[in-house]
């Protein structure tokens, strides 16, 4: 009554419906805070058909599951959800088959109003399932077919291009590239960025210096060993992920090669292990907490009915120059 609004308008304002102006929503929410009003979530779910929960399914078999970034990412998702008046529902799956089964169960039981999908895939069964079910979702990564897709992504392709230019300015001409898992959208984009950097620097890409599908420390060690044992090995290696770059350190140590002097290495992610490596790893750092907040915010807007084409954002990784890159001494 104090706001001179109908009960229906107040309800729609509290639930973030797009037909209610932002100014009205803000007035209603401020009054609700002053009156210490908290809607009963169960009753609200019955009335609106919404759970006010965002879903996130963690694939335990994935190489990211134990990585430090996950804690920051989940903290961001949780903070972003809470800021929008939502909770975060986290489920887990131990295989790709179980992953889709888990999504089907969550959909059937209406456990969430929408889903955050980490690590977008080139052919993504999660996207196909949620599209067909007409359930809102947001991707951490991009899709070639954007229909119905909201996303937030870091422009890894720009980072790879910048990495090549950095190495070129240091005099490197034989630059290797160890890409990530080709099932993921990021690998295609980062590969394109590497090639764009080589073209910009006026250098041809040597296919013998390209490796694909490396995502772990061991993958990086194995790929780098192949490159470094060539008759004409690279003087620098760009890696699509930091874990792989740290694997390059191991391969170099195996062969008695000094990182930063005889071989330059650039990574991508900004994990703490890279900062503590000897020498510290030159990389492109990603703020995973901020990404989590952004994804949750976009998903709530999508749930509220905002068109998906208005909910696609990208940001840049931050270049962190450290001791793993230096002038080429093999001119």
Can you say where each PLM-predicted feature lies in the sequence?
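Flexible loop/turn connectors
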Residues: 225-331
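Flexible loop/hinge segments that line or gate small-molecule binding clefts
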Residues: 118-162, 203, 243, 269-281
């Amino acid at each position: 009554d104090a706001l001179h609004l109908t009960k229906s308008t107040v309800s729609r304002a509290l639930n973030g419906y797009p037909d209610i102006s932002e100014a009205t929503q803000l007035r209603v929410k401020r009054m609700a805070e002053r009156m210490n009003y908290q809607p009963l979530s169960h009753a609200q779910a019955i009335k609106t058909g919404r759970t006010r929960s965002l879903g996130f399914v963690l694939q335990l078999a994935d190489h990211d599951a134990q990585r430090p970034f996950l804690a920051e990412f989940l903290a961001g998702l949780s903070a972003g959800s809470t800021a929008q008046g939502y909770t975060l529902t986290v489920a887990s799956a131990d295989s790709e088959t179980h992953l889709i089964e888990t999504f089907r169960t969550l959909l059937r039981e209406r456990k969430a109003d929408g889903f955050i999908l980490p690590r977008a895939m080139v052919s993504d069964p999660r996207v196909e399932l949620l599209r067909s079910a007409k359930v809102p979702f947001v991707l951490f990564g991009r899709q070639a077919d954007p229909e119905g897709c909201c996303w937030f992504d870091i422009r890894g392709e720009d980072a790879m291009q910048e990495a090549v230019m950095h190495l070129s300015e240091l005099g490197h001409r034989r630059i290797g590239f160890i890409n990530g898992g080709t099932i993921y959208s990021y690998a295609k984009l980062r590969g394109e960025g590497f090639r764009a950097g080589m073209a910009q620097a006026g250098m041809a890409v040597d296919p013998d210096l390209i490796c694909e599908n490396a995502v772990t420390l061991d993958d990086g060690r194995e790929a780098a060993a192949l490159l470094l044992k060539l008759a004409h090995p690279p003087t620098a290696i760009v890696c699509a992920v930091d874990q792989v770059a740290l694997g390059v350190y191991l391969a170099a140590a195996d062969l008695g090669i000094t990182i930063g002097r005889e071989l330059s290495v650039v990574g991508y992610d900004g994990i703490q292990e890279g900062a503590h490596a000897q020498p510290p790893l030159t990389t492109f750092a990603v703020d995973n907490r901020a990404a989590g907040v952004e994804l949750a915010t976009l998903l709530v807007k999508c749930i509220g009915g905002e068109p998906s084409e208005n909910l696609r954002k990208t940001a840049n990784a931050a270049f962190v120059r450290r001791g793993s890159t230096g002038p080429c001494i093999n001119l």
